[in-house]
Amino acid sequence: MMGEFKHPPQEKQKMSSTKKAGYSNPAFAAMGIPALRLPGPKWCAFWLVVGAGIAGVVYDKREQRRICKHYSSLVKDQGAAHMDTWLKPRRLTVFVAPPPGDYLETSMKVWRRYVKQVLFEAGLDYEVFTEERQGVIRHEVAERVRQLRRDIAAAEAAEQRALDEKRWLNRMRSWWRREKLSEEELERIRAQKFRDEFTYKQLLGVFYKNAPLREQKVWDADALVEDPVLAGGVICIGRGAYKEYIAGIHEGTLGPLDPPTLTPEAPTELSAAAEDLTQAPEQPEPSAAAEALKQAPEQAEHSPAEPDSAATDAPDEKSNNAPAPPPAPYVSPDEYSSLSLSQELVGDVRHPSSHIPALFHQPLLVIPVPNLSGFLQTPRKIYRFYTRRYYAEECCKAAAAMVLQTIRPFQPDDLNLGISEEEDWPRRWVEQGRERKSEWVQDLKADPRVIAELHVVDPALMADLAATMNLN
């Protein structure tokens, strides 16, 4: 056909191989800005994956902040309520234990990020007890109960002694047998009385030169409640802390006040069982013979006459630096049924001086700490990392339930509180714990007489409480 121009095959191939020019504004081209082109498929896929990952993290973090703010707003009215100067706020006791094979900081993050914020907004006071070694929380709880028993017994003995002194015959005897004290003894008694009665309110603050306000006694809010269940509270962060708390309550209420005598073989077994299993296994240390061979040339150069002094001092330094194992339990779980409940702990038990209800009367809250370990658990770790908001809501809701006191009696099934955490425990750690008779891997046992005094905080009752608040 006339007028039709056909390109040679070589020129067609060159035109097809050249890339199409992107969009370019004439003004941009005049300024030297290159043409805008869309990235290739590979770059699009890369930025899509990176953007989705970052967006998932940002969304999850934002939801966590929203959840914490929501549950903090539910208890904010209690923190803004009026409180007298002579009244101390409600006080909680928090026991924190690390997950197996990890550090204590893992559990402390749960406390700081989710639980502490809600308690702070509610205006509650708290005491945090942390420990990495197994058995220390159990001993601490048992010792608090035993000390309460000692104080109650001492108060009863002092009351009986005061009643005996009021009798006229005893007063005549004391007057007849009394001895005249020297001036030094009287001065010592006056000094001790001054130290016992001295407070900084006599010198500082608004109490200075204000006798009525200074003499006013300060009371704990927990001591003024009629029902001991509504006083204070106990929070166990971690399944291990909960197991030790239950064991410590049984040991303190059923066991003796003084430690039992142990056989010579028992301390070795108990120290091995109480060894810290929460940390990763340490590297094997070189033997004493290898250390002696390694230090032999240096000792020959510096002090050839005393080659054994350094070798004998090294074990002593190591033994002094090593922490002592926690004391062994006074009673074993198999002995619960054969032991009698202490007479001091019958009925409404309160401290003689502070009038605060006993620890086992206060409501209990358990917060599990899920923690996966191992390379094969990577997919589950990634899923939990992007869905942390669900765990945050569980923790914040439980903390709000503790503040609002949604309490119910303790049931035998409540021994399984936080048992889902044990599914994440490393198998190797569990096997080693069974060989060493660890407290955490043993079945949790309880006595009906002890758990009858316990109460738990149930976050599931929050819905009923919210409905009641809406109706009112």
From Swiss-Prot:
Annotated region described as Disordered, given as residue ranges: 1-20, 276-336
Compositionally biased spans, kind Low complexity: 279-292
Biological processes, Gene Ontology terms: protein insertion into mitochondrial inner membrane
Topology class, membrane: Single-pass membrane protein
One Gene Ontology MF term: protein transmembrane transporter activity
Keyword annotations from UniProtKB, A to Z: Membrane, Mitochondrion, Mitochondrion inner membrane, Protein transport, Translocation, Transmembrane, Transmembrane helix, Transport
Record-linked Pfam families: Tim54 (PF11711)
Mitochondrial matrix side: 1-37
Keyword Membrane part of the UniProt annotation: yes
Biological role: Essential component of the TIM22 complex, a complex that mediates the import and insertion of multi-pass transmembrane proteins into the mitochondrial inner membrane. The TIM22 complex forms a twin-pore translocase that uses the membrane potential as external driving force.
Record-given protein name: Mitochondrial import inner membrane translocase subunit TIM54
Originating organism: Eremothecium gossypii (strain ATCC 10895 / CBS 109.51 / FGSC 9923 / NRRL Y-1056) (Yeast)
